[in-house]
């Protein structure tokens, strides 16, 4: 029983090393009882250790070749960027989105951004191979560089709206009078003219009994009787003008005619005259 368990243990240990060293497990096994290998001297090493050391040497050779290739690619990329004038300036010229006319405002308002120096060499990737020939996952992940955001200039309507929103509702008339010569547009409502006239008509009036006499006094409204007199004068002037313009409305103004005697010949005289005035007869007893 002890001998059978010893054979099973030795077979399992040999099978494990064959799997690690990449040997074919379908090959015929060694004849005879399997015994654990024994070392006769310090210089003698088992065959599986020799195979493992050979695999490690192959891994190191692969890593060195990959590092050399990546160094060559980094040098070629750096020379290409230097010939094009730097990747940052080239991308700024083609991807800024601003013309020469509108670009002045953006360049003046843009915050100073420190120019990132071009890296001398890219970080080298090391892909190590395991004993069985499969690539091992890298332990140190590559840190992602956050994109650089350029501040965009504000449009003219947005800047004016922020400027005028700071004013209170009752102070916009004063701002209109004080800043009337500025070129900034004033954002008002639909009934802005009515509000402006209403605020101007309701100016405060200083009392005659309070305060010192040296201050500026607002002009008081005229009494009611003065308003009535001005209305009567306006009506009289309108009536006189209407009377003066009555004769000018005709195509041929009337000529002054001598007074005719009140007799039978009056009607005949009126009929013989060529006046265009209508004949109005108050006394028709003679007809």
UniProtKB/Swiss-Prot annotation:
The keyword Cytoplasm applies. Residues 138-147 have a biased composition (Low complexity). One of its GO terms (cellular component) is nucleus. It comes from the Eukaryota. Pfam families: FAM212. Keywords: Cytoplasm, Nucleus. Residues 261-287 are annotated as: Inka box 2. Residues 35-50 have a biased composition (Polar residues). GO terms for molecular function: protein kinase binding; protein serine/threonine kinase inhibitor activity. Interacts with PAK4. Belongs to the INKA family. This is PAK4-inhibitor INKA1. It comes from Homo sapiens. The gene is INKA1.
């Amino acid at each position: 029983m002890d001998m059978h368990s010893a054979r099973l243990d030795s077979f399992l240990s040999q099978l494990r090393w064959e799997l690690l060293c990449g040997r074919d497990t379908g090959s015929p096994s060694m004849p005879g009882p399997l015994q654990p290998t024994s070392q006769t001297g310090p210089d003698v090493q088992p065959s599986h250790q020799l195979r493992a050391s050979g695999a490690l040497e192959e891994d190191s050779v692969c890593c060195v070749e990959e590092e050399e290739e990546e160094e060559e690619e980094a040098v070629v990329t750096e020379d290409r960027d230097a010939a094009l004038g730097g990747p940052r300036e080239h991308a700024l010229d083609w991807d800024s989105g601003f013309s020469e006319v509108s670009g002045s405002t953006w360049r003046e308002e843009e915050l100073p951004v420190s120019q990132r120096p071009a890296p001398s060499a890219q970080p080298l990737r090391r892909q190590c191979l395991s004993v069985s020939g499969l690539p091992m996952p890298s332990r140190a992940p590559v840190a992602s560089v956050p994109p650089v955001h350029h501040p965009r200039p504000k449009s003219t309507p947005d800047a004016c709206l922020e400027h005028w929103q700071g004013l209170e509702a009752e102070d916009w008339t004063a701002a209109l009078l004080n800043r009337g010569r500025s070129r900034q547009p004033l954002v008002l409502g639909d009934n802005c003219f009515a509000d402006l006239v209403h605020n101007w008509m309701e100016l405060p009036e200083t009392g005659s009994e309070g305060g010192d006499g040296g201050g500026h006094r607002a002009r008081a409204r005229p009494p009611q009787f003065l308003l009535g007199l001005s209305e009567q004068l306006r009506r009289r002037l309108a009536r006189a003008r209407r009377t003066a313009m009555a004769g000018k409305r005709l195509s041929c103004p009337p000529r002054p005619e001598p007074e005719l005697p009140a007799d039978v010949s009056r009607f005949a005289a009126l009929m013989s005259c060529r006046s265009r005035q209508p004949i109005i007869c108050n006394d028709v007893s003679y007809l």
